[in-house]
């Protein structure tokens, strides 16, 4: 048990999928895992452990933003011995050829700031995904026929960002999408010698201002979860 996770030793699997929304963690566990058991509900942040095709998996919420994810990822890696963390979540597309419901595999995650930025000081650290996970996820997505994009994303600390100039530069430099967690996830995984990947579904589009209706978001995320699970155990 840690300050923010109430799970007992051994309750957390070495492979953890991390949606931002704790209710999405519950939905994914009930839909994809056999015999899921709730292992954490401290502060309403739900975590479940169960089996998928004979493999033990935990699905645990991270909350919104890098400061929140940093708390849970640190404790999962440091105190519970997690070896593989895969973020499953939504993102906003920043390129014209990326469409709603497409899946994005984040090869790199640029950011202005993470909770780890004070460690690096003047160094412009470049967080990146684990290549083995990235390759496995790409193959899994290809097998499903899912529209998929691989490349850099941007992790923002601010949801309501009033920086149109920054967005323009992201688009100009080929950044695929914006979200709020992956840069810190990749940084922490590197520090703890673990594997990490962000598998994202496009729910909004910054260029066209399109957005998935709330009732479609959950049903559109099934491919993303299956890709993450297949990548983790390929």
Curated annotation (Swiss-Prot):
Pfam families associated with the record: PNP_UDP_1
InterPro entries: DeoD-type, Nucleoside_phosphorylase_CS, Nucleoside_phosphorylase_d, Nucleoside_phosphorylase_sf
Residue positions binding phosphate: 20, 24, 43, 87-90
Molecular function GO terms recorded: purine-nucleoside phosphorylase activity
Catalytic activity: a purine D-ribonucleoside + phosphate = a purine nucleobase + alpha-D-ribose 1-phosphate; a purine 2'-deoxy-D-ribonucleoside + phosphate = a purine nucleobase + 2-deoxy-alpha-D-ribose 1-phosphate
GO biological process, alphabetically ordered: purine nucleoside catabolic process
Positions of the record's site feature: Important for catalytic activity: 217
Signal sequence region: none
Assembly: Homohexamer; trimer of homodimers.
Family the entry assigns: Belongs to the PNP/UDP phosphorylase family.
Protein name per the record: Purine nucleoside phosphorylase DeoD-type
Organism field: Jannaschia sp. (strain CCS1)
